[in-house]
Design a protein with these regions (language model features):
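Solvent-exposed, non-transmembrane regions of membrane-associated and secreted proteins
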Residues: 1-164
Length: 164
């Protein structure tokens, strides 16, 4: 679902029908940093949208489930998570930064991200020209804290050549 300004994604499925699981919502698919919001349900429903993401704060699970795929209309993008943090009101880092005016601004943003990271994969070296995905969900169904994952695109598959 692409953002249309409302919060319908919290309570509807892809078909617009009521759903306690909601639907992931993408902010601006053409920016350098796609921001995806999803519901943490926590109502005893397993594997629903982003409910399990908070478990990636465990280092073993972080490295085990570090790769994910984003399926778009005409392509599939492969991403690797390199950072996870939990945001509360005191977090001084603009994880919602969509584009960067210069390489210096980008590397400053990455340095700020490292400062607040619970886990940061030092094997990945994000570059100014890379594309990213930021995923945000609630820490749990009752908290105002947010789990933030930052991932870099490592590969893209087109639907035409079926290489995926």
């Amino acid at each position: 679902m692409i953002d249309a300004g409302g919060k319908e994604y919290l309570y509807q499925n892809f078909d617009g029908q009521p759903s306690m699981c909601g639907t992931p919502m993408i902010f601006e698919t053409k920016s350098k940093n796609k921001i995806i919001y999803g519901h943490h349900v926590g109502y005893g429903v397993e594997n629903v949208v982003f409910t399990k993401l908070s478990e990636l704060t465990d280092k073993k699970l972080f490295y085990e489930y570090q790769t994910f795929y984003l399926c778009m209309q005409d392509k599939v993008e492969e991403y690797r998570v390199f950072l996870i943090t939990v945001k509360n009101k005191e977090l001084d880092w603009n994880y919602q930064q969509k584009d960067f005016t210069s390489a210096d601004k980008f590397y400053e943003w990455i340095a700020d991200a490292k400062k607040v990271a619970l886990i940061y994969d030092t094997d990945l070296k994000p570059k100014f020209n890379d594309d990213f995905v930021t995923i945000q969900t609630c820490l749990d169904a009752y908290s105002s804290k947010r789990v933030i994952l930052l991932a870099v695109k490592i590969r893209e598959y087109t639907m035409e050549n079926d290489s995926f």
